[in-house]
C-alpha cells in the first residue's frame, strides 16, 4: 500500500502530537456540491451510485478536490446492511429510505440472520478503489450505522419522527428487539472488519437515533451493542492502529459511559460544549466535532468566530478532530465550507507544538 502523505487525522484520533487540528465533514460528499449532483444524475439513482465502484470513488474524491480536507469517507449508506439482509431497501422521492419488508412480526424476526458479506462486495470494492485513487493523500474512513439506529429503520420501515413502533417493541417485547440488535451487531462487526481488510484506515459507527432513548434504554439497547462491535473489530491493519470513532447524536449525556466501551474517539453533536466534554472524558478518548452545520449559513466572519470559539474551548494539545455536529446540509454554500476548512487549519496551529 502507498505511504500515507498526511496522517494528521489518524494521529489526532490517537492523541499523538500534530501540527494543526485536522478536519473532515460528515456527508462531505453530497448534495451541496454541484459536481456530486452531476455524478448522481449520471448514476440514475442513489442506490445505483452506491453500487457503482467507479462513481462511488468519484464522489468520495470530489470534496478533496475542492477543500483541503484531512480525511476521505467512503461514499455509501448505513442501510446497505439491512438491505443485504433481504429487507428490500428503496428510496421514495421526497420521503427518504424505505423497506418493503419491515420487521414487525415475530416470525420475520426469528428468520433474521447475518447476511453473507459477498452481498456487500460492492462496498468493499469501493473501499479498495478509493484507496487506490487517494494514492496516500489522506486516510480513508469506513463506516456503519449502529445496531439500534439500523433497527429503527428496519422496524419502522423507514424514517420516523416519534419511533412509536420500535419503542412499542422495546417496552412490550424487548426479547424481539434484542434479537434484532444482536444480529445487527454481528453483521456490523463483520461489515466493518471487511471494510478494514479492503483498506479502510479508520471506522466510524453512526448512532443517529440513540439520542431518542431514555437513559436506561440507551445503555441496554444501544450502547451495549456498540460495545459488542468495538470488542470484535480489527484494530491493526497495514502495520498501524485502525482508530474507531463512535458518534451518537444527542449522546452528550452519556459521554462517560461511551468513553468506557473501548473506542478511540467520540463524536459530539453541536449541543455539547467541547471543552466540558474534554474535561469529562478527554483523558480516555479523542473528541470529534462539533460545529453546528447551520452555522455555515452565517457570514464568513461568523464562521471564523465560531471556529475560533470551538478551538479555544478545546484548548491546547492533540486529541481533537474538527467536524460538524451532524451531516452538512444540502443547501450549504460550498464556498462557506471552504472558509470553514481553511480557518480550522489557520487558527488551530497556535494550539499545537511549542
From Swiss-Prot:
Subcellular location: Cytoplasm
UniProt xrefs under PROSITE patterns: UROD_1, UROD_2
SUPFAM superfamilies tied to this protein: UROD/MetE-like
EC number, as in UniProt: 4.1.1.37
UniProt GO cellular component terms: cytosol
Keywords of this entry: Cytoplasm, Decarboxylase, Lyase, Porphyrin biosynthesis
Group of enzyme by EC: lyase
One GO molecular-function entry: uroporphyrinogen decarboxylase activity
Main localization, broad class: cytoplasm
Annotated residues for binding of substrate: 27-31, 77, 153, 208, 326
Catalysed reaction, written as an equation: uroporphyrinogen III + 4 H(+) = coproporphyrinogen III + 4 CO2
Function: Catalyzes the decarboxylation of four acetate groups of uroporphyrinogen-III to yield coproporphyrinogen-III.
NCBIfam families: hemE
Name of the protein described by the UniProt record: Uroporphyrinogen decarboxylase
Species per Swiss-Prot/TrEMBL record: Neisseria meningitidis serogroup C (strain 053442)
Amino acid at each position: 500500500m502507498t505511504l500515507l502523505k498526511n496522517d494528521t487525522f489518524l494521529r489526532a484520533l490517537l492523541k499523538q502530537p500534530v501540527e494543526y487540528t485536522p478536519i473532515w465533514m460528515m456527508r462531505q460528499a453530497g448534495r451541496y456540491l454541484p459536481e456530486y449532483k452531476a455524478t448522481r444524475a449520471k448514476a440514475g439513482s442513489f442506490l445505483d451510485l452506491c453500487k457503482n465502484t467507479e462513481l462511488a470513488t468519484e464522489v468520495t474524491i470530489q470534496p478533496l478536490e475542492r477543500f483541503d480536507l484531512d480525511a476521505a469517507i467512503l461514499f455509501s449508506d448505513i442501510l446497505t446492511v439491512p438491505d443485504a439482509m433481504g429487507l428490500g431497501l428503496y428510496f421514495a422521492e421526497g420521503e427518504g429510505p424505505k423497506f418493503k419488508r419491515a420487521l414487525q412480526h415475530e416470525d420475520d424476526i426469528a428468520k433474521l440472520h447475518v447476511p453473507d458479506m459477498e452481498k456487500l462486495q460492492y462496498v468493499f470494492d469501493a473501499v479498495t478503489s478509493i484507496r487506490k485513487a487517494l494514492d496516500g493523500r489522506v486516510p480513508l474512513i469506513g463506516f456503519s450505522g449502529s445496531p439500534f439506529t439500523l433497527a429503527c429503520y428496519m422496524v419502522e420501515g423507514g424514517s420516523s419522527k416519534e419511533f412509536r413502533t420500535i419503542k412499542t417493541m422495546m417496552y412490550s417485547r424487548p426479547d424481539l428487539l434484542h434479537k434484532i440488535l444482536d444480529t445487527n451487531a454481528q453483521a456490523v462487526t463483520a461489515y466493518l472488519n471487511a471494510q478494514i481488510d479492503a483498506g479502510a484506515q479508520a471506522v466510524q459507527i453512526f448512532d443517529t437515533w440513540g439520542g431518542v432513548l431514555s437513559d436506561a434504554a440507551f445503555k441496554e439497547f444501544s450502547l451495549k451493542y456498540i460495545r459488542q462491535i468495538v470488542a470484535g473489530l480489527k484494530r491493526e491493519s497495514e502495520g498501524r492502529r485502525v482508530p474507531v470513532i463512535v458518534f451518537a447524536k444527542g449522546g452528550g449525556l452519556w459521554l462517560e459511559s461511551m468513553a468506557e466501551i473501548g473506542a478511540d474517539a467520540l463524536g459530539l453533536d453541536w449541543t455539547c460544549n467541547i471543552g466540558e466534554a474534554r474535561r469529562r472524558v478527554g483523558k480516555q478518548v479523542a473528541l470529534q466535532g462539533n460545529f453546528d452545520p447551520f452555522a455555515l449559513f452565517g457570514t464568513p466572519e461568523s464562521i471564523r468566530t465560531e471556529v475560533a470559539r470551538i478551538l479555544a474551548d478545546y484548548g491546547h494539545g492533540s486529541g481533537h478532530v474538527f467536524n460538524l455536529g451532524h451531516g452538512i446540509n444540502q443547501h450549504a454554500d460550498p464556498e462557506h465550507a471552504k472558509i470553514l476548512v481553511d480557518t480550522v487549519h489557520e487558527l488551530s496551529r497556535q494550539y499545537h507544538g511549542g
